């Protein structure tokens, strides 16, 4: 599908990290002495290890720098490391893999798409852009209902649960990030369409701000709150403040100015009272005053 699953267990066979870690005896058994020595130099493997006496393989520098340091031809080093990794990968494939949670969550896929799009733009990597673009198209196809609203998640191809504000906010940010790579109008049009949807379903038309759940949610909804605090992920209202500014800069839609102003006003007292709980919202406010601060 080209989308991202939600989670993987850390342990397998009752041991945390077992699938991913390596012991020195194991590496010595699998590799020739020269290959093992080269692996140790490139990945800084020692007796102490870096995870409970064993090692999570972590390349210490880019291969070009390592080739210079070791006095080796760059192409030769790349080939050697590729062969070593293929050997270790084949052996690891025989291990019991951690359980994979195959739910596809709109919010989290939006975050991954945005990350790949940003990397594509900054690193000039076409392959990263293709990954992001394909995932975005898949999400829009699989997680968009007939009425245009979003589903929050899917499992085994079956979509369910009406999207939350965070799903819209992160996917909208992803579409904007994709537009920024090549200025393809398709992504900006998709972003503007999603913006219209989130304004219709989540925007408090009386007091401003975005509700966590759609106002037309099916099923009982006794209280519909507005959340501004960042937790493990960014709050939907903070993300939307950034999105509104980004859309204004790219589309010139003047109505966005009013939404931005009201979004800041409605949460000003809450953020002033407890600023440390809403750093991303404050970053958005700073961007209004000082310009884009995303790279700070």
Per-region residue spans from a language model:
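Glycan-recognition and catalytic cores of secretory/periplasmic carbohydrate-active enzymes
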Residues: 1-296
């Amino acid at each position: 599908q080209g989308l991202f699953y939600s989670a993987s267990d850390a342990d397998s066979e009752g041991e945390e990290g077992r699938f991913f870690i390596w012991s020195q005896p194991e590496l010595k058994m699998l590799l020739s002495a020269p290959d093992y020595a080269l692996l140790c130099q490139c990945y800084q493997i020692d007796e102490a290890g870096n995870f409970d006496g064993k090692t999570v393989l972590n390349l210490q520098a880019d291969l070009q720098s390592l080739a210079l340091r070791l006095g080796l031809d760059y192409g030769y080093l790349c080939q050697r490391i590729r062969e070593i990794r293929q050997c270790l990968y084949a052996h690891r494939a025989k291990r019991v893999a951690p359980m994979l949670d195959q739910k596809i969550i709109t919010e989290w896929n939006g975050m991954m798409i945005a990350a790949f799009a940003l990397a594509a733009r900054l690193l000039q990597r076409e392959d990263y852009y293709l990954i992001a673009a394909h995932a975005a198209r898949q999400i829009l196809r699989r997680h968009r209902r007939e009425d245009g609203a979003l589903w929050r998640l899917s499992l085994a191809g079956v979509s369910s649960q009406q999207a939350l504000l965070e799903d819209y906010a992160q996917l909208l940010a992803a579409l904007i990030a994709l537009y920024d790579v090549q200025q393809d109008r398709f992504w900006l049009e998709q972003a503007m369409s999603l913006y219209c949807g989130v304004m219709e379903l989540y925007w408090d038309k009386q007091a401003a701000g975005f509700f966590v759940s759609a106002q037309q949610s099916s099923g009982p909804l006794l209280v519909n709150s507005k959340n501004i605090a960042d937790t493990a992920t960014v709050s939907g209202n903070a993300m939307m403040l950034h999105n509104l500014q980004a859309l204004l800069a790219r589309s010139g839609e003047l109505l966005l100015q009013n939404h931005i102003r009201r979004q800041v006003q409605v949460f000003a007292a809450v953020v002033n009272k407890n600023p440390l709980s809403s750093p991303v919202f404050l970053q958005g406010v700073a961007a209004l005053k000082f310009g884009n601060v995303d790279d700070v």
